[in-house]
């Protein structure tokens, strides 16, 4: 949830700069990660659980793209980019491990 809160703070900054298109995109993908992880907790079976985690992983990958774009275009400082990207990378690693474990337990 902390990552999503940081993304929402970034969205607020971007909207103050009237960058609504990219703000909306990173807002959707960045907050969707946690929402899909939360949904996975109440999945209707193993396949649904894996599906929700894979969706969260896709959203984390998309968020990484938006973070890089914002940094390269000057909207995100190197310090802010590194902080958010490190957290996003950690989320991706956790999701990959969780999906792989769940798939292994599926057999």
Question: What does each model-identified segment do?
Answer:
Residues 1-107:
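Short, C-terminally biased terminal segments at protein or domain edges
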């Amino acid at each position: 949830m902390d990552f999503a809160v940081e993304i929402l703070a970034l969205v607020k900054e971007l909207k103050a700069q009237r960058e609504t298109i990219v703000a909306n995109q990173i807002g959707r993908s960045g907050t969707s990660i946690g929402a899909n992880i939360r949904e996975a907790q109440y999945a209707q079976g193993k396949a649904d659980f894996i599906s929700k985690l894979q969706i969260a992983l896709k959203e984390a990958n998309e968020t990484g793209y938006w973070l890089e774009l914002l940094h390269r275009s000057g909207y995100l400082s190197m310090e802010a980019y590194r902080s958010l990207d490190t957290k996003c990378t950690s989320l991706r690693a956790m999701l990959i491990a969780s999906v792989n474990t769940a798939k292994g337990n599926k057999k």
